[in-house]
Design a protein with these regions (language model features):
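Conserved DEDDh/DEDDy metal-dependent 3′-5′ exonuclease domain
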Residues: 28-111, 115-119
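Acidic, Mg2+-coordinating catalytic module of metal-dependent nucleases/exonucleases
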Residues: 104-180
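TPR-repeat structural position
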Residues: 143, 192, 225, 258-259
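Residue at a conserved register position within TPR or TPR-like alpha-solenoid repeats
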Residues: 186, 215, 219-222, 252-253, ...
Length: 297
């Protein structure tokens, strides 16, 4: 869903255009747009928008958590309508930033259309011009200036639907650098099986050390310490990374039961405080001494 408003927030800003796209059980897509033709029609607009939002099992927006949802909630309060029941809300802006910011920088929706989805809108309007177009319509009654605003709103919700589809089955279409970011995003969401599949694909494509590191992190999170150790050990041969040595030292000590190798990594520097490193070194030296003692006849 997406809104067009008379301002950037606050009690005086009004939603004058609401757009929502949803899918029916047969896979058909439906787009509904609600236009506030005059201020006195705000109540029915909010009522119908509330019906559409309440019927959704998942809300999808682009910066909607910070802007669209709060302004709709404020307008409902101002019109003495009850608050809507909470719904799961996927804000694609946060997903896009995690996935694409390293490659694209700014993550405007039109940027994603061009560089991720591969298309460019035709005639469009900058968001900063939208309120003045609506003000002109209220003064003159001429709807022609609103045509591009309505199309802009429709494009926004259609693009969100396309992004949801892309992120659902992304591996063949995402650039290599975005695969690593997607794996990290799945890991943060604790979708570890999906994270592992994406990380495996990134490694298979030869994305590089970043893919190997995230795959090791995911393996560790899944409890597959043997796989994590393999990936971290391969990285440690190429990288001078104190944090990586710390992860590997822990795995050698507690999983592989190789305190000598863990001690070597600790002495090489693990980025810990001096006190923590000293405790780790002392503990490992005791384990090595006990192991030697048990081997003596």
């Amino acid at each position: 869903f997406d809104t067009e408003t008379t301002g950037l927030g606050g009690a005086g800003s009004v939603v004058f255009l609401f757009g929502a796209l949803w899918f029916d059980p047969d896979g058909g897509a439906w787009l509904e747009q609600l236009l506030l033709r005059q201020p006195g029609e705000e109540l029915p607009l909010l009522h119908r928008a509330g019906e559409l939002l309440s019927a959704a099992s998942l809300l999808v927006s682009y910066n909607g958590k910070a802007f669209d949802a709060p302004i709709l909630a404020t307008r409902r309060v101002m019109n003495r309508l009850p608050a809507l029941a909470p719904r799961p809300h996927l804000d694609l802006l946060h997903v896009a930033r995690r996935l694409h910011r390293a490659r694209l920088g700014a993550c405007r929706l039109t940027t994603l259309e061009r560089d991720v989805l591969g298309f460019v809108r035709g005639e469009d309007i900058d968001g900063s011009e939208v309120p003045s177009r609506y003000s002109h319509y209220l003064r003159t009654g001429d709807p022609e200036g609103l045509r591009v605003v309505v199309e802009h709103n429709a494009w926004d919700v259609v693009t969100m639907a396309a992004l949801v589809g892309l992120y659902g089955e992304p591996l063949d279409t995402l650039p290599d650098v975005d695969l690593v970011a997607l794996a990290r995003t799945y890991r943060r969401a604790r979708a570890l099986d999906a994270a592992a599949r994406v990380a495996d694909d990134a490694v298979a494509r030869g994305v590089g050390d970043a893919a190997l590191r995230v795959r090791g992190d995911i393996a560790k999170a899944r409890g597959d310490r043997a796989a994590a150790l393999r990936d971290f050990a391969a990285l440690c041969e190429r990288l001078d990374d104190a944090g990586l040595r710390l992860e590997l030292a822990k795995l050698y000590e507690h999983h592989a039961k190789e305190p000598l190798r863990a001690l070597e990594l600790t002495l090489a520097g693990t980025g810990e405080t001096d006190a923590a490193a000293a405790r780790r070194q002392a503990r490992l030296e005791r384990k090595i001494a006990r192991a030697k003692g048990s081997e003596e006849p």
